Amino acid sequence: MKLVTSEEIKRLEERLEREYSIPPILLMENAASFLFSFLKEKFEDIENRKIAILCGPGNNGGDGVALARYLYSNGIRKITIFSYLWGKKISDLLKIQLGLLKNLVEIKDILQDYTELKEYELIVDGIFGIGLKREIDDDLKKIFRYINNLGKKIISIDIPSGINSDTGEIMGEALRADYVLTMFLPKVGLFETGAVDYVGEVIVGRLGIPIEIVNDIVESNIHLVDWELLKDIVRIPSKGVHKGKKGKVLIIGGSFRYTGAPILSALSALRTGAGMVYLAVPEKISMVYRGNYPEIIYIPLKDKDGYISYDNLGYILEIIETYGIEAVAIGPGIGINEDVRRLVQDFLRKVDKKVVVDADALSFVKDILGDISGKDVVFTPHYGEMSRIVEESVETISKKRVEIGRNFVERYKLNLIIKGPNSLFFDPKNHVYVNPFADFLLATAGSGDVLTGIIAGFSAQGYSLKEACILGNFVHGYSSVIWKKYKGSVGLTASDIIKILPLAIDEVIRRRNV
């Protein structure tokens, strides 16, 4: 599913009117109908609930006023509009909606009467829509904080008021929505870092316009990864295949300081369905694993001061060819020293396989980007690692990750995942794929090592690196959904993610057949 900016929505509505004779007022009526249907289906006994509708001076407020009329017309009378209109220039469509509503529903001034909101069960937020690009007034900041502290169910129209729909930036303060009912397509800002704590479940309303028409008009190359998109990626495993044909993965990493990371990656690769996983680690720490993880094939490497020695480079490249390795992951637990730097840099220059580069290996890539441009490689940095690669602050990365990621892949023609809430995958053609999951459960030690193994595992099984990144990001995130369903909202570990992986993958396969 495409994600869109406010400008793209503006162009969409203009073309719908110009080319299909669909006027904006009809779209507003359809939006109100969509909102009404959601409220009626989601909340039992809706006619007996007190509903507050917050309306601003723009078309978002027009949607809210139209909703009030729909509710009233369907016998739901416990409605009050709290308006933010005094002294404001109101939109033409809002004027029409106010005229249609007449005096059927009580309208109060939110600046004067906001404390009365504590008496309402449901709050529909239509103050600001996708056009907000400035910081909100101090009075509204205070009111938004008051509303957020009430603990009421908040349903936002298009986007929670106070969020920049293009960047996800909080414009001073924003409402924390339990549900966001967004029109046509989801907005980019809903899935940006700044908005994570303000955006609940996102539900898309098509407003009676076929998705084929919308996609034909909207040129966005930012995509939300959903079940429909995954249908074109995931494959059903062949029943007759043997282990040698199920994919061979090599994990390179480990050091005397970090013994756990590479084993997490190796086990994750196995759990994706890879037939054979080889683990190349310093000889001394390979002895730690052997008795505990018999499924893994160990390749002991010469070490120097507890780190992988540069002398192993030729041996590793030989193993890749001799054993028919199809995908490699380098970095988990590998540590930082001069030998490791030389090993990582020369390995990436010489290797000709699909490669996942993660963790400390990312510390050495900045100086060789030109040498490896165009290779079948994916970097998987978190914000801190990305900041070192592109020499930008972590704060800048978090606020401008789409722009920074696009600039990076356009210049170096590499694959890139910027990890974090709603992780982003960038392919070399500058398409962006947004992971729908932003759960804090995934922020746990070793979670990134698991993702590395997942991507390498899928890559070895015949998936392109792009497909492996999209699918891997999704099942990694979906594991948190499964954990919440059966275990609760705390306590997910990297080892738990590995155990859950087959369930997450199986669900993707099951939905492919629906």
Swiss-Prot record:
InterPro entries: Carbohydrate_kinase_pred_CS, CARKD, Nnr, Ribokinase-like, YjeF_N_dom, YjeF_N_dom_sf
GO biological process: metabolite repair; nicotinamide nucleotide metabolic process
Region: NAD(P)H-hydrate epimerase, residue numbers: 1-218
Domain YjeF N-terminal: 9-215
This protein's record includes keyword NADP: yes
UniProt-recorded Gene Ontology molecular function terms: ADP-dependent NAD(P)H-hydrate dehydratase activity; ATP binding; metal ion binding; NAD(P)HX epimerase activity
Stored Pfam families: Carb_kinase, YjeF_N
Signal sequence residues: none
Annotated EC: 4.2.1.136, 5.1.99.6
Record-listed K(+) binding positions: 60, 125, 161
Required cofactor(s): K(+)
Residues reported in the UniProt entry to bind (6S)-NADPHX 2: 333, 449
Catalysed conversion reaction: (6S)-NADHX + ADP = AMP + phosphate + NADH + H(+); (6S)-NADPHX + ADP = AMP + phosphate + NADPH + H(+); (6R)-NADHX = (6S)-NADHX; (6R)-NADPHX = (6S)-NADPHX
Coiled coil spans: none
Stretches the record annotates as NADPHX 2: 382-388
Ranges for region ADP-dependent (S)-NAD(P)H-hydrate dehydratase: 226-514
Domain YjeF C-terminal: 226-508
Sequence positions that bind (6S)-NADPHX 1: 158
Note on cofactor: Binds 1 potassium ion per subunit.
Keyword vocabulary terms for this entry: ATP-binding, Isomerase, Lyase, Metal-binding, Multifunctional enzyme, NAD, NADP, Nucleotide-binding, Potassium
Transmembrane segments: none
HAMAP family reported for this sequence: NADHX_dehydratase, NADHX_epimerase
Role this protein plays: Bifunctional enzyme that catalyzes the epimerization of the S- and R-forms of NAD(P)HX and the dehydration of the S-form of NAD(P)HX at the expense of ADP, which is converted to AMP. This allows the repair of both epimers of NAD(P)HX, a damaged form of NAD(P)H that is a result of enzymatic or heat-dependent hydration.
PANTHER family: ATP-DEPENDENT (S)-NAD(P)H-HYDRATE DEHYDRATASE, ATP-DEPENDENT (S)-NAD(P)H-HYDRATE DEHYDRATASE FAMILY MEMBER
UniProt-recorded name of the protein: Bifunctional NAD(P)H-hydrate repair enzyme Nnr
Organism annotation: Dictyoglomus turgidum (strain DSM 6724 / Z-1310)
Lineage, top ranks: Bacteria, Pseudomonadati, Dictyoglomota, Dictyoglomia, Dictyoglomales
Gene name of the record: nnr
